[in-house]
Structure formats: C-alpha cells, structure tokens
C-alpha cells in the first residue's frame, strides 16, 4: 500500500496500525498537503457481506457527526479493485490507555477534564442517533495539544435499530468496559455507553479497571453481579462527589444510571466545584 494513491488524492505514507477488520494508514492529502488517516478494509473481506456491512455502518455513523471531540470522517470511497476506505482525521498523540499505562492513576481533576470531553462527544453522538457501543481508553485519543477525541465507531449502531451486543465483533480489551446488558447480549441503548464511560473514568481515577478475571466470561459475570469497589478506597484523592458520579454511572440496571450524557456531564462539573457534596 505504501505510495499508493487512493481517489487520485490520498497518498499512503506509512502504517499506523491494524485491527481484525481493517488496516489504518497515514496518508497525505495531495490537494491540501495535510496528513490524514485512511482506514482500509482488509482485502480478504472485500466480498464478505458481514464485514462490508460493518464498514459501511461505521461510515454511516461517522457521517452523522462533526464534533471537536470526535475523530471526524473526511471522505469515503471504493476503488475499482474493490478497496474500501474511510478517510478520517489524523491525530498525532497517544491513546488514553497508553497514558494510564505510563502514569497509573491520573490526578482526579485531570481525569474529570478528560471525561468531560468524552461525555461531550458521547452526547453529540447520542443526539445524532448513534450509540458507540465500544467506549474504552484504547478508543480515546489525546493529541499533542491535549485535545481529547473519541474514535472507532466501527461497531456503532443507529439508535433506532435493533441494537444488541451479540455480534462477535468485540475484542478481549472491550470486556473490561462492557455494560451488564452487553455482557449478557441484551438490547443496549445510550445508557450502555454511559456505563462504559463510567468504567473508563474509574480506570483513570484508580489506575485499574472496575473488574478483572481470567476469562471474558468471568469479567462479564462481575459486571452483572458484583458491585465495584468505590474509587476512593483505591485512591483516597478521589472526592465523595466523584465517587458518586462513577458509581452512579456503573449501576447494574440501566434505569438506575444517568438518564443522559448531559446529566452525567453536569454532575462531573458540579463534582469539580463542590468535591465534598453528593
């Protein structure tokens, strides 16, 4: 792929990484001179209806959204040889997972500022009828200027579709952030994303995920049955107000969680202003 030009415009420069479905390349937009990321469906899936549909679904979901805290879709296309690609913003930086692995628990005020931006992105997605379904630190990017961007809407679904989590599209890394409804393959809605945001917030505040286990099934069962240890018991710097936000987001039953990303966003901001008030 190196040096190949897609659509007469996007010149592939180097590899950025790969997943089970697609490879991601750094490319230069010959029209503007700027660098972009190009996500290319693997060649072996060009004629696979399931993977083509999933790739198209990502494009459909991404096309609904334009937000400073989302990795935005710039272009989409199919080459004459069947090569399918998405052109997205190139983010020069690290994933949130890398930050946590390098630093351990983040300062609560920094973690809160990051989660505020994640929630702004999630709120925008939900307002546009998109449920992400795979919120995790690996899908949250932080660029060199400190801008937070949510990426990878590859398993997102339009909210009015029959949205279940029974697809075998997830990876082991996702199960640590699964909502209980995802863990049992039930229908999911916007509140499932909020649970996952809560799990990410938990990890930022404590340096560890809410639940661990030797197998994905063992971890999933804990999401379903075991209450999480309050973050403040692991990191005493976590305020009562932030404890409340995280544990409210991690309620087992969707009806007991925040009603919306906006509600959770409000409480995170209040927790920063009044850390000892619940």
Positions of the model-derived regions?
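Activation segment signature within eukaryotic-like protein kinase domains
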Residues: 114-115
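Protein kinase catalytic-loop region centered on the HRD/HxD motif
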Residues: 118-130
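Conserved short submotifs of the Hanks-type protein kinase catalytic core
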Residues: 81-95, 99, 103
